[in-house]
Amino acid sequence: MTDQAFVTLTTNDAYAKGALVLGSSLKQHRTTRRTVVLASPQVSDSMRKVLETVFDEVIMVDVLDSGDSAHLTLMKRPELGITLTKLHCWSLTQYSKCVFMDADTLVLSNIDDLFEREELSAAPDPGWPDCFNSGVFVYQPSIETYNQLLHLASEQGSFDGGDQGLLNTYFSGWATTDITKHLPFVYNLSSLSIYSYLPAFKAFGKNAKVVHFLGRTKPWNYTYNPQTKSVKCESQDPIVSHPEFLNLWWDTFTTNVLPLLQHHGLVKDAGSYLMMEHVTGALSDLSFGEAPPASQPSLSSEERKERWEQGQADYMGADSFDNIKRKLDTYLQ
C-alpha cells in the first residue's frame, strides 16, 4: 500500500547502520508498505546514498534550517534537538498512517498487521508500564498534531528529556482510555527485559516480532566475528546470556548491509577478522560506529531512584545484577 509507511530516523552515520538493518529486516519479511527514513544533516552524503538503496524514501530534516515553529522551539529548548527531529514524522501527510520504529530495532517477522491499529498504539515501557515506549508506535500524520506537539515541547519540555516523555504527556490517555492501543510487548521486546525478567522471556520470547536494543551499548558498538557468527561480549554484559538477537542483527548486517557499504566505498576491507573505529577504516572483527558513551559520573541515591522510575536503570554498571545481589546480601546476612 503506497499511502502507508514504516518510518525511522537517523541522526548520524552510526545510527544509519541501525536504520539500514531495520530497513533490510522489513524488506526481508516482505512488508507491503513503503519504508521511509528521516535523516539529519549529520548523516554523510555517502551514507545517504546507501540509505536510498534500502528505503523507498529518504527525507532530509534540518530543524535549524526549517521555516516552521520547530526552529523557534529549538531555540527555546536546545536540549530537545533530536526529539524535534523525530517529531517531523507527523509532517509526512502524504501517508494516511505510519508506524514509527527507532533505528535500534530489528524486525523478526512480518508486522504489517500493525496498520490495523489506531493512533497512538504502542507497547508498555518496561521501566514504567503506565507509559508507552516510543521505540515503536502507530500514528497518523497530521500537521495539526505536529504543531501541537511543537507547542507542548516549547511550553513544557519533556519530563525525561526526550521524545518519550513528550509523547506520553501529549497522549496522556494511553494508559487508561483504550486497551486496544496497547501493543503486545512482543512488538517492542526490550533486549534489557530479557535480562531483568528471564522467566517471561523463556515463556514468550519465541513469539517476539520486534526486538528493541535499549541501553547505552547498541549492536553496532559490539565486535563481531563473521567466521564464528558470534558477537564478542564482556562477561558482565546482560546480553551475553541470550545473544541470539544481537547475533541476528549482525547476520542481517553482514548479509544485506555490509555489501552496500563496500559498494559505496564506506568499507575498504571487510576481511574475516578486522577492527574498525570509523566508517571508512580497515576491518577485522567487524566493529562499526562509535564506542559506547563514556561512563556517567556517580549519582546520588535519589538520582538513581529517579532514573529507575523513568526506566533508565544502569543495567551495565551500578544497577547490574551482581551489584544488586551484593547489596541484598548485606541486608540478608
Swiss-Prot record:
Gene3D superfamilies: Spore Coat Polysaccharide Biosynthesis Protein SpsA, Chain A. Pfam families: Glyco_transf_8. Residues 287-316 are annotated as: Disordered. It is an enzyme of class 2 (transferase). Glycans are attached at residue 195. GO terms for biological process: glycogen biosynthetic process. One of its GO terms (molecular function) is protein homodimerization activity. Its EC number is 2.4.1.186. Coiled coil: none annotated. SUPFAM superfamilies: Nucleotide-diphospho-sugar transferases. Disulfide bonds: none annotated. UDP binds at residues 9, 11-12, 15, 77, 102-104, 212, 215, 218. Keywords: Acetylation, Cytoplasm, Glycogen biosynthesis, Glycoprotein, Manganese, Metal-binding, Nucleus, Phosphoprotein, Transferase. Transmembrane segments: none annotated. Its cofactor is Mn(2+). GO terms for cellular component: cytoplasm; nucleus. Glycogenin participates in the glycogen biosynthetic process along with glycogen synthase and glycogen branching enzyme. It catalyzes the formation of a short alpha (1,4)-glucosyl chain covalently attached via a glucose 1-O-tyrosyl linkage to internal tyrosine residues and these chains act as primers for the elongation reaction catalyzed by glycogen synthase. Belongs to the glycosyltransferase 8 family. Glycogenin subfamily. Part of the GYS1-GYG1 complex, a heterooctamer composed of a tetramer of GYS1 and 2 dimers of GYG1, where each GYS1 protomer binds to one GYG1 subunit (via GYG1 C-terminus); the GYS1 tetramer may dissociate from GYG1 dimers to continue glycogen polymerization on its own. May also form a heterooctamer complex with GYS2 (via GYG1 C-terminus). This is Glycogenin-1.
